[in-house]
Every structure is written in structure tokens, then in C-alpha cells.
């Protein structure tokens, strides 16, 4: 699967945002257990430095979460790659992302040619993410709303990626998962969280698996402009 996006000259990057630096990040991800080549190619291609403040650009290709304002973060690249790899295993076409944030996770999914729907409760973050999607020529459908509700009008989804942690998986989101689909989400409180994958079998039965310990911001209700 070849990543699809339009790269402007400033997207290519120089110095600490150069292709060489991105390649080193991909090798670190590979060494850390990410095996799916489509995921690794998308991580190599999508310019993470465009999804953070310019002052932090020199750290864009470190394998660490970084602040994006409003008490939110852009996720650690390994976590983005692991979540992407997990949902690609069910060969999805249509994906729901809960928590647009900077737009980086959604951009990775869109670069893989998936039909992406993303919901963000913080209006300012969503406006910035939309500009980035347009800049990269990505057709990502986005909505300013309470992410815990999902986007049922366009469901069911082959895959659902949740980028903030709740004490338990949210029933309203599980209800929007198609038969054969997979939901990946962090579950837990401030002191302990796990990345959980939930798969709905052909018979409708639900199977859960814990993938890794993680740390995410909390999944909150309501909306902010």
C-alpha cells in the first residue's frame, strides 16, 4: 500500500526534519516491533513536523509525545504506528477517528488510502488540523462534536481509532463498529492505561486483546470552541 499525499517543498524538511531523520525514526519503530511495511511507509512519508508548533520542529521525529496546546498532545510515533498496524490487519476501507488533535493520526490513515472520518471536541485544534489536511491534499471528513458520541450517520466503520483514554470502552463507539471490524483505544485512568483492541467477529461476537501499556490524555465529554 503506497502512501498518497501531495508534498509541498516545505513538507520535505531540512536538518532535523529531513528525510534522513524520518528514515531513522522508521528504523527505530521497526526495532521496537512495528512490522507492517505500509504503516512504516506512511510514517516515513507524512511530515510530522507540520503537525506541531514550529518551535518544536527539531523534536518532530523523536519517538515521544509532544504538546499541541489546550492540554493535548500529538501521540508518540510508536503508538500511532501500533494503532495503525492493528487496524490495518482487518483490511479496513472506512475508518472513524475519535479525537482529531493535531491531525497526525488521521493523516497517517488517509495517506494509506483509507476513507477517514474524524471527530474533535476542541474547535481550535480541529481548525488547525483541517488546514493541514488541505495543505497535504488529503480528503479527510471532519466534525466538531463530542467524540464519545462518534459519528453514527456515516457508520458502521471497518475500524475505529480512539486517541484519548476512557475508564472503559465506550458503548456508543462499539455500536458503530462493523461486523469484522476492529476498534483500538486506550483504556484506564491517569495512573494506569492499556492499549486495547476489540474485534467484532463474523458472528457478531466481541474479542478483546491488550496490546501494550500506554499514556494518553483523558477522553472528555462536551465541546469547546
Swiss-Prot record:
The entry's keywords = Cytoplasm, Methyltransferase, S-adenosyl-L-methionine, Transferase
GO terms for cellular component = cytoplasm
Superkingdom, natural source: Bacteria
GO molecular-function terms, A-Z: protein-L-isoaspartate (D-aspartate) O-methyltransferase activity
Q: Please classify the protein's predominant subcellular localization into one broad category.
A: cytoplasm
Q: Give its E.C. classification number.
A: 2.1.1.77
Q: Which Pfam families match?
A: PCMT
InterPro entries given in the database record: PCMT, SAM-dependent_MTases_sf
What catalytic reaction does the record list? Answer: [protein]-L-isoaspartate + S-adenosyl-L-methionine = [protein]-L-isoaspartate alpha-methyl ester + S-adenosyl-L-homocysteine
List GO BP terms, alphabetically: methylation; protein modification process; protein repair
Intracellular or extracellular location(s):
Cytoplasm
Give the positions the UniProt entry annotates as the active site.
75
Job description of the protein: Catalyzes the methyl esterification of L-isoaspartyl residues in peptides and proteins that result from spontaneous decomposition of normal L-aspartyl and L-asparaginyl residues. It plays a role in the repair and/or degradation of damaged proteins.
Q: What is this protein called?
A: Protein-L-isoaspartate O-methyltransferase
Q: What is the lineage of its organism?
A: Bacteria, Pseudomonadati, Pseudomonadota, Gammaproteobacteria, Lysobacterales
Underlying gene? pcm
